[in-house]
Regions:
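N-terminal export signals
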Residues: 1-18
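Short, glycine-/small- and polar/acidic-enriched structural segments
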Residues: 20-151, 156-159, 175-178, 196-200, ...
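Secondary-structure end/capping motifs
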Residues: 34-35, 216-307
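Stable alpha-helical elements in mature extracytoplasmic
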Residues: 46, 69-72, 87-90, 137-140, ...
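Short linear loop/turn motifs
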Residues: 62, 262-274, 311-326
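Soluble non-cytosolic domains of exported or imported proteins
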Residues: 131-139, 163, 214-221, 287-291
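Pocket-lining segment of extracytoplasmic ligand-binding domains
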Residues: 158, 163-259
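Conserved C-terminal helix/tail region of periplasmic/extracytoplasmic solute-binding proteins
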Residues: 293-343
Length: 343
């Protein structure tokens, strides 16, 4: 069933029949347990405009779900993933190695350190802290420790999947955790003793393999057009947003065996706050020398959290990719206002 179709008839968007051999697959890495990127990826997977565009040149879309962005980096490097939704720390790693073209903003918000019975960052000393290695929340934890004059060696790091953290805190298996939404909101809802002791700003991005954009430029633009459509469609009405969040919840259930525990209204509020209400999103300005992302790069490099061959110039090049600009300035050609989502 078609969810919605506006803006005209489906037609060609510039793909040429010779642009790819038969049977090629555009493989998208997704994170079903994170909002709002899971809502976007759920829409991209159901986007019939994208499916028809790809089919004209014998391409198809496939998705691979992951619990954390750092698990996607080796596959993105090996080109087993064409594109991925990544937090800022994995994005920096991929970009600094020259392997990424950064398309646009997926999330602008904060990640949180949530503790049970803790008041300050300094209270983390000698405590067990749940975290996801090389994630945006890991960077937030490193920031917090640095501000408190603590080292990672002065806490006990407990690697956990993001959907395990709230229950681990409730069972007293850990004393605190660093995570992204919806984990932090869920923890606050579940127990009055849970409180946020630190927040750090964070961003997520849609990233395409750099070499993929060079070898298959129009396929890359077709994916970007679907990305833009997803955000436009959610902005059109609350009904659309609710549907996208329900589909995202279905993806989370399929991936982890259980639905996201927050009520629908809170999940939609996260998508609105972290993406739809962000001015100009998904557009993102290239970072300059004073940007938070440059500061993050320098901070992680000092701590030895980036590969030795990582270079800031590669990050600047990654942000220089003009795919989003092309799609937005040629919106009619790329059908960014044509919506057709499979139920």
């Amino acid at each position: 069933m078609q969810a919605l179709l506006v803006g005209g008839m489906l037609g060609p968007v510039g793909l040429r029949a010779a642009s790819a051999p038969s049977g090629h697959t555009l493989v998208l890495g997704t994170q079903p347990l994170g909002m709002p990127c899971s809502a976007i990826s759920a829409l991209i997977q159901r986007d019939q405009v994208l499916q028809q565009t790809l089919a004209r040149t014998q391409w198809r879309l496939s998705h691979r779900p992951f619990g954390k962005g750092s698990d996607m980096l080796p596959l993105l490097s090996l080109r087993q993933l064409s594109a991925a939704f990544l937090g800022d720390m994995p994005t920096l790693v991929a970009a600094a190695l020259g392997e990424a073209a950064i398309v646009g903003l997926v999330k602008q918000t904060s990640t949180a350190i949530v503790g049970r019975g803790l008041e300050r960052i300094e209270d983390l000393r000698d405590k067990r802290v749940g975290y996801v290695e090389a994630s945006s929340a890991h960077y937030t934890l490193l920031q917090a420790l640095n501000l408190a004059g603590l080292q990672e060696s002065q806490i006990t790091l407990v690697p956990l999947a993001v959907d395990q953290m709230v229950e681990a805190l409730e069972r007293n298996d850990i004393d605190a955790f660093a995570a992204w939404e919806p984990a932090s909101s869920l923890a606050l809802m579940r127990h009055r003793a849970h409180r946020v002791i630190f927040r750090g700003s964070t961003t997520d991005y849609l990233v395409i393999n750099h070499f993929f954009t060079q070898e298959h430029p129009e396929i890359s633009l077709a994916l970007i057009a679907s990305f833009v459509r997803a955000i436009q469609w959610m902005r059109l009405s609350r009904l659309n947003l609710d549907k996208a969040v329900r589909w995202a919840n279905d993806e989370a259930t399929s991936f982890s065996g259980r639905a996201l525990a927050l009520p629908l209204r809170q999940l939609t509020a996260i998508v609105e706050r972290d993406l739809l209400d962000v001015p100009a999103a998904p557009w993102v300005s290239p970072p300059d020398a004073q940007s938070p992302l440059r500061q993050e790069f320098e901070f992680l490099a000092r701590l030895g959290k980036l590969p030795s061959q990582a270079r800031w110039g590669q990050v600047e090049r990654a942000f220089g990719y003009d795919g989003l600009s092309k799609v937005l300035t040629q919106s009619r050609q790329y059908q960014t206002h044509v919506f057709n989502y499979r139920e």
